Amino acid sequence: MIVTVTPNTCVDYTLLLPEFRLGETLRATEAAWGMGGKAADAAWILGRWGVPSLAMGFAAGQIGQRMEAMLQARGVATDFVEAEGETRLNVVVVCAKSKQQSTLTANTLRVRAEHVDQLRSRYMRALDQASCVILGGSLPEGAPHSLYSDLIGAARARNIPVIFDSSGSALRMGLAARPQLIKPNQAELAELTGQVVKSLEDAYQAASVLQRTFGVDLIATMGEQGALALIGQKHYYIPPLRVEAVSTAGAGDAILAGMAVALSRREPPEAGLRLGFALAGAVLRTLATADYQPEDARRFLEQVQLLPWPS
């Protein structure tokens, strides 16, 4: 079974506005609830695709209850540790006129040492049935900076593949524990390597440094430029799909979901890349974070290109 861990859980409430102006009452033309938190997003996406998973992490309050109910409605098993405060509620604002989006968030979830101990204990039990682990997102207030590296190390000690997606110090510390796969974006590549990353060639050079240094596979996402995948000795460029994006929230997490399916089933990485980017394309077409129509994903499966890189 695929196991996902989201320490700083959240739910996204997305508003579509004709245009955005400060200082005025703005009326949305559409609103949608979606999942939030990278690993939980992946679990929600997997559930809609019919792939079972176990979602873990910390949760609290009414928003935490809503999040668990949303996951369970997709057939996802849940085992969240009840923490303090409230699971985050993110407000995502999508502006139809400018094609830009912004996210309003606040750190409302708090954990104590006993909560962390509970999560570690439950996680170790979950590893008994895990075929792949997805870890992702930020860390809540009170969580130790070493949490991700500890969880990664425990899974790797059992030869369970780990997909890891975070940012900042959490990403750097987790990377040192050598997960199997990470998915840095353009800014994260630059931060991790200290290199300027503007072009695909820049991204390839930075990703190659990380692959050599940490022995990790990478999918480097470069927005409208597409993505690069460095999976062992196989290096690919994935051109962007032709999609009229409604919202980008959750699309990257769909890539994690696709790769987890391939790793869990011991399929070739190419199968995971095709599924992941097809799911991502479908997510782009939907306002709610990490939501999609399976028929869109099936259609995009035939359109995903894996081009050898360097060409």
PLM region spans:
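Glycine-rich phosphate/adenosyl-contacting loop at the front of the ribokinase-like
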Residues: M1-M56, G64-R66, P239, P310-S311
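Hydrophobic anchor at the start of a short beta-strand
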Residues: I2, V51-S53, T78, V162, ...
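Conserved N-terminal subdomain of the carbohydrate kinase-like
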Residues: E24, R48-A130, R299-S311
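Short beta-strand scaffold segments in enzyme catalytic cores
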Residues: W44, V91-V93, G226-L230
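Gly/Ala-rich phosphate-binding loop of Rossmann-like dinucleotide-binding domains
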Residues: G47, R156, S264
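Short beta-strands and strand-loop turn motifs
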Residues: T103-T105, A130-S138, D165, K183-E191
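Conserved phosphate/ATP/ADP-binding segment of small-molecule kinases
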Residues: H145-K234
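Conserved phosphate-binding/catalytic region of the ribokinase-like
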Residues: R172, L200-S311
